[in-house]
């Protein structure tokens, strides 16, 4: 691992990844890979998660293509130096911020959306001019092998490499020094990544998860609400980091919500859900058994059918869920939807705030003041009102968590910023030295007054006239001296 990282760092130090033209070429090559090898990509993801080609394309491929196009369109503007506002002391100088690549980036991908959650941060890292080591999740084995095969055929083989393996390989990778680590996964591993990064003072972006609440107000159209929740919850068999994890609603709404979700599930997946090409499977047997354990002691309103041989768990809704039970203590990451009755919106807000900050918050109501109130009085990585998941689709938004749901953000310009150092640059002249006398010893009260005037905009009114006359005299002297030389 050490040799691989050293090789990538040497490639970065060559400066090859920095020019705008090179970055654009690599992004175009990545787009070409997605377009030319679409069938290989679809097949690999389908094999890992039993996804239909339509779901793979709509949930992963199209997002990657959109992100690349967005970068290609905007990158020439983003890489340019940006002038900044100057103060009196620097008014004759050149002051700007220059985005600069961080260096060698490690991207540790996720298994639930193994293509988009690995390639999307890669797009940002390339756009920012970095070298990258990509570590796909070993749980999505077919996608990991596909990335290791295809990426070297299209991208610079020295600057961008794929390393496959399990816990042992990842642990060894984390011992190496990187300039940024980008991790997508669960909170427990996120802490391990952050601890390893701290040994080298390496900054991290942690895209984690959590229990994303969904509050349903009594003042809304339940038919529409339940269709949108059903789509977001059971997409990818519930294995989505921003899927609605549980519902908060008044007890009087519970039976209606159950019935409407049940009818929507039939509409989406048919009478025999197990045979639907649009309904995926749990990634492996370990996660299958973990999810089943969450059903113990729960009141199943509908669903609950399972098949261990195919890792099938039917869309399931639980009612009257006790907040102290296991299903409410950890992120579900599966097709189980608990309903927790609350008395009103006040209790819902308190319920959310008493727990770890979620990756997403969903609020359904015709009353936009209520939605705004929940936004103002809670904290989460992102919010969507009257829908679910959709804030992920807007690449002008930063996507990321807060607290235990993560740190840092990406997508669009936010990806470029995450993988860039905003370097402040001040260029002064070696002339006009007379204007610098105020900052050189010996010090005096008049110099303190000048400092207040220039830097703090605080001054003694009685001395204002004298200060202004002195300032004008210095400026005149500087100009005369500059003209003389």
Curated annotation (Swiss-Prot):
Residues 1-463 are cytoplasmic. Belongs to the aldehyde dehydrogenase family. The active site is at 207, 241. The chain crosses the membrane at residues 464-484. Its EC number is 1.2.1.3, 1.2.1.94. This is Aldehyde dehydrogenase family 3 member A2. GO terms for molecular function: 3-chloroallyl aldehyde dehydrogenase activity; long-chain fatty aldehyde dehydrogenase (NAD+) activity; medium-chain fatty aldehyde dehydrogenase (NAD+) activity. Homodimer. A motif (Prevents secretion from ER) lies at residues 481-484. GO terms for biological process: fatty acid metabolic process; hexadecanal metabolic process. NAD(+) binds at residues 185-190. It catalyses: an aldehyde + NAD(+) + H2O = a carboxylate + NADH + 2 H(+); a fatty aldehyde + NAD(+) + H2O = a fatty acid + NADH + 2 H(+); (2E)-hexadecenal + NAD(+) + H2O = (E)-hexadec-2-enoate + NADH + 2 H(+); hexadecanoate + NADH + 2 H(+) = hexadecanal + NAD(+) + H2O. Keywords: Endoplasmic reticulum, Fatty acid metabolism, Lipid metabolism, Membrane, Microsome, NAD, Oxidoreductase, Phosphoprotein, Transmembrane, Transmembrane helix. It is found in: Microsome membrane; Endoplasmic reticulum membrane. It is a single-pass membrane protein. CDD domains: ALDH_F3AB (cd07132). One of its GO terms (cellular component) is endoplasmic reticulum membrane. It comes from the Eukaryota. InterPro entries: Ald_DH/histidinol_DH, Ald_DH_C, Ald_DH_CS_CYS, Ald_DH_CS_GLU, Ald_DH_N, Aldehyde_DH_dom, Aldehyde_DH_NAD(P). It is an enzyme of class 1 (oxidoreductase).
